[in-house]
């Protein structure tokens, strides 16, 4: 356990930030799972709405520092290819 006031404060800040990052990561992963399920399911309209929501959440995760911008870009590119393949049939 930290003894200095500044170390105690940093520990508190770390707990707060960890909880916030965990919530944002969980929200993002849930949305990704929903999109992948929709792609596997088949309804093209649902896939498009899920995709737009997923892209929005990925961009928000980048803004909040949860994801690196290149990681989010990679996710979006791969998901976009899967959505395009699914909706073009």
UniProtKB/Swiss-Prot annotation:
UniProt GO molecular function: small ribosomal subunit rRNA binding; structural constituent of ribosome
Which cellular components does GO assign to this protein? cytosol; small ribosomal subunit
Q: In which domain of life is the source organism classified?
A: Bacteria
Q: Which InterPro entries match?
A: Ribosomal_bS20, Ribosomal_bS20_sf
Please provide the record's keywords in A-Z order. Answer: Ribonucleoprotein, Ribosomal protein, RNA-binding, rRNA-binding
Instruction: Return any one Pfam family short name.
Output: Ribosomal_S20p
Which portions of the sequence form the region Disordered?
1-28
What's a GO biological-process term for it?
translation
Q: Does the keyword Membrane apply?
A: no
Report the sequence similarity comment from the record.
Belongs to the bacterial ribosomal protein bS20 family.
What is known about what this protein does? Binds directly to 16S ribosomal RNA.
Q: What is this protein called?
A: Small ribosomal subunit protein bS20
Annotated organism of origin:
Koribacter versatilis (strain Ellin345)
Primary gene name: rpsT
